[in-house]
């Protein structure tokens, strides 16, 4: 409660000071630009109307946009169709894929509760591809 009373008193004391600062402003009739309204003693604060584009700049911008559109179309035409892979190479992930490993002696080997799977050659005694 005491804090609210102190803040109220501070605000009431500060209001006359802010009103006195506003009294020194120029009358509103003679003001031509918004930067003169707030600070008449500082000319040119940089508040200017946006510059109009010249016809040369507009033509250059149109040419750039047209060139970008043509480049996108040409990129799509020159792109080769993706080759659908029928197998997974050695040491590449085979997790969730329904295609076999490219190497006939490799198998999809999974570790860490089937969270990490990759094509790997496994050497066993019964496997004809085993390393000897």
Swiss-Prot record:
Q: Where in the cell is it found?
A: Secreted; Golgi apparatus lumen
Tell me the protein's name.
Answer: Agouti-related protein
Species lineage, top-down? Eukaryota, Metazoa, Chordata, Craniata, Vertebrata
Kindly state the tissue distribution recorded for this protein.
Expressed primarily in the adrenal gland, subthalamic nucleus, and hypothalamus, with a lower level of expression occurring in testis, lung, and kidney.
- Annotated signal peptide: 1-20
Query: What coarse category fits the chief subcellular location reported for this protein?
Result: secreted
Annotated Agouti domain ranges read: 87-129
Function per UniProt: Plays a role in weight homeostasis. Involved in the control of feeding behavior through the central melanocortin system. Acts as alpha melanocyte-stimulating hormone antagonist by inhibiting cAMP production mediated by stimulation of melanocortin receptors within the hypothalamus and adrenal gland. Has very low activity with MC5R. Is an inverse agonist for MC3R and MC4R being able to suppress their constitutive activity. It promotes MC3R and MC4R endocytosis in an arrestin-dependent manner.
Q: Which parts form a coiled-coil structure per UniProt?
A: none
What is an annotated GO biological process for this record, any one?
response to insulin
Q: Which effect does the record note for changing residue 111 to A?
A: Abolishes inhibition of cAMP production in response to melanocortin receptor stimulation
About its domains, the entry says: The presence of a 'disulfide through disulfide knot' structurally defines this protein as a knottin.
């Amino acid at each position: 409660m005491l804090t609210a009373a102190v803040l109220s008193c501070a605000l009431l004391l500060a209001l006359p000071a802010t009103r006195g600062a506003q009294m020194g402003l120029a009358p509103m009739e003679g003001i031509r630009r918004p930067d003169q309204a707030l600070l008449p003693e500082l000319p040119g604060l940089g508040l200017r109307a946006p510059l109009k584009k010249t016809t040369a700049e507009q033509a250059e911008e149109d040419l750039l946009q047209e060139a970008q559109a043509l480049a996108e179309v040409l990129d799509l035409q020159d792109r080769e169709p993706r080759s659908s892979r029928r197998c997974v190479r050695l040491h590449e992930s085979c997790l969730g894929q329904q295609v076999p490993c490219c190497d006939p002696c490799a198998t999809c080997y999974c570790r860490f509760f089937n969270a990490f799977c990759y094509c790997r050659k496994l050497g066993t005694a019964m496997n004809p591809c085993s390393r000897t």
